């Protein structure tokens, strides 16, 4: 079971019989409409296999979330460029939830790179996985039972060679595969 805030029903519970493994696609920093005009084909190809979509903020317009929700249920947190319209879609500043036994937390800005993992461990002590965004720089680090993951940005790569998203599979509360995917 997945409890999920989606659309204009922020307290909605989505009960689904997910396949095993469960496929999760993670995006951040889409910055529509400046960089995201519509879902890029390489992103859509990954989303077509998703059971759940996580967006770590800087959506900028709720139409992106509506488009993503056409593929799978969406969890989203507010980014520093998101306004009341994205909040009204159901985006809190942080989120903590369970996916098939995996404790997940999401936040947009994780602070400076130095000390990030211990800082997120203190902020989300129950989490197995913390998803974050803001920097547009992919990041995947693990220590002491915590994994932190920034998917980068699919559309505003900044100083990175490619636009990226993250894809992972979950079975029985375990991350089985995590991949940063080039979507340029």
Question: What are the language-model segments listed below?
Answer:
Residues 2-8, 12-74, 82-93, 101, ...:
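N-terminal active-site segment of His-dependent metallophosphoesterases
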Residues 21, 27, 99-100, 122-126, ...:
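Binuclear metal-dependent phosphoesterase catalytic core
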Residues 136-148:
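A short, charged
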Residues 94-95, 138, 166:
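Residue-level detector of beta-strand structural context in well-folded domains
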Residues 62, 114, 139:
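Short glycine-rich, flexible loops that bind phosphorylated cofactors or substrates
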Residues 31-34, 82-126, 153-160:
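Active-site-proximal segments of metal-dependent phosphoesterases and phosphodiesterases across multiple
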Residues 68-71, 121-125, 143:
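Short, conserved loop/helix-junction motifs that constitute active-site signature segments
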Residues 26-28, 52-58, 75-80, 106-108, ...:
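Active-site neighborhood of phospho(di)ester-bond hydrolases with catalytic His/Asp-centered motifs
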């Amino acid at each position: 079971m997945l409890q999920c805030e989606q659309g204009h029903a922020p307290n909605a519970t989505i009960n689904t019989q997910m396949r095993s493994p469960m496929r999760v696609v993670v995006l951040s920093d889409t910055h529509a409409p400046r960089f995201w005009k519509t879902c890029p084909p390489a992103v859509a190809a990954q989303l077509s296999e998703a059971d759940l979509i996580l967006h770590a903020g800087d959506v900028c317009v709720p139409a992106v979330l509506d488009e993503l929700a056409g593929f799978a249920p969406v969890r989203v947190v507010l980014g520093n460029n998101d306004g009341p319209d994205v909040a009204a879609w159901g985006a809190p500043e942080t989120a903590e939830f369970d996916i098939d036994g995996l404790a997940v937390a999401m936040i947009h800005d994780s602070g400076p790179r130095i000390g990030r993992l211990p800082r997120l461990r203190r902020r989300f002590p129950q989490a197995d996985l913390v998803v974050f965004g803001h920097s547009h720089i992919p990041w995947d680090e693990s220590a002491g039972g915590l994994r932190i993951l920034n998917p980068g940005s699919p559309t505003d790569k900044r100083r990175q060679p490619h636009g990226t998203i993250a894809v992972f599979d979950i079975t029985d509360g375990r991350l089985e595969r995590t991949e940063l995917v080039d979507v340029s």
